[in-house]
């Protein structure tokens, strides 16, 4: 397994409110965590870095080695982090702070993930890009209800309004998923600064191109910047090879 992480401020923003990192626990199991923060001043930067780092530090200390244990860990620790960031957000300096969150662990040939907000996790297998997560956003709710067409959703002025985040008052309702991995698969975690700028077919073409993994993440970010770079752009790309998928 090979992992490449990259974050970029984009073309329009002055600070980067995204954060990404990966961690390995005592059982040698890898977890990748990506967050896209929100809130005025530096609140968004703090929320995203805090969520990623707190969860990562907690993960490193575990011996977790099964998919079921990961799921229980997600359910417990994500809500703890939600409340922690919500409490901090009561302080005037951090008013409105929150963050999206994508957390993905790899156990043998399985990936298990938790999703909150409108960052995304995708699987690139063969010649196809499959979006594994469904955005927790107002526009996606309207789309699913048949009140918007995909084209209208794409250009909707309220596209950035999310319906769930880490740091909200109410208990979070994360989406959980698992995927059985095959040799040659790629997993992509990204903030919306990537997928608002480039299409699934462009992602697929870049990820399946014959260049080193780090060059693929750089190319994804470059394409998003060339398309306008309207937001921070963050990607975590995982390549599964023969041994991982057995």
Swiss-Prot record:
Name its cellular compartments: Cytoplasm
**Top-level taxon in the UniProt lineage:** Bacteria
Output the Gene Ontology terms for molecular function.
metal ion binding; protein serine/threonine phosphatase activity
Q: Which GO terms describe its cellular component?
A: cytoplasm
Kindly list the positions annotated as binding Mn(2+) 2: 36, 192, 231
Cite the InterPro entries for this sequence.
PP2C (IPR015655), PPM-type-like_dom_sf (IPR036457), PPM-type_phosphatase-like_dom (IPR001932)
Q: Name one GO biological process term.
A: signal transduction
Q: Which UniProt keywords apply?
A: Cytoplasm, Hydrolase, Manganese, Metal-binding, Protein phosphatase
* Cofactor(s), by name: Mn(2+)
In the UniProt record, does the keyword Mitochondrion occur?
A: no
Question: What does it catalyze?
Answer: O-phospho-L-seryl-[protein] + H2O = L-seryl-[protein] + phosphate; O-phospho-L-threonyl-[protein] + H2O = L-threonyl-[protein] + phosphate
Per the UniProt record, which EC number(s) apply here? 3.1.3.16
**Enzyme class, broadest EC rank:** hydrolase
Per the entry, the cofactor note is:
Binds 2 manganese ions per subunit.
Tell me which residues make up the PPM-type phosphatase domain.
2-240
Q: Where does Mn(2+) 1 bind?
A: 36-37
Q: What is its main location?
A: cytoplasm
UniProt family annotation: Belongs to the PP2C family.
Instruction: Supply any other comment.
Output: Overexpression of PhpP leads to a phenotype comparable to cells lacking stkP, with an increased cell length.
The role this protein plays is: Protein phosphatase able to dephosphorylate StkP-P and other phosphorylated protein substrates. PhpP and its cognate protein kinase StkP appear to constitute a functional signaling couple in vivo, PhpP's primary role being probably to control phosphorylation levels of StkP and of its targets. PhpP thus performs an essential control of StkP activity.
Q: What is this protein called?
A: Protein phosphatase PhpP
Q: What is the protein's species of origin?
A: Streptococcus pneumoniae (strain ATCC BAA-255 / R6)
GN (gene name): phpP
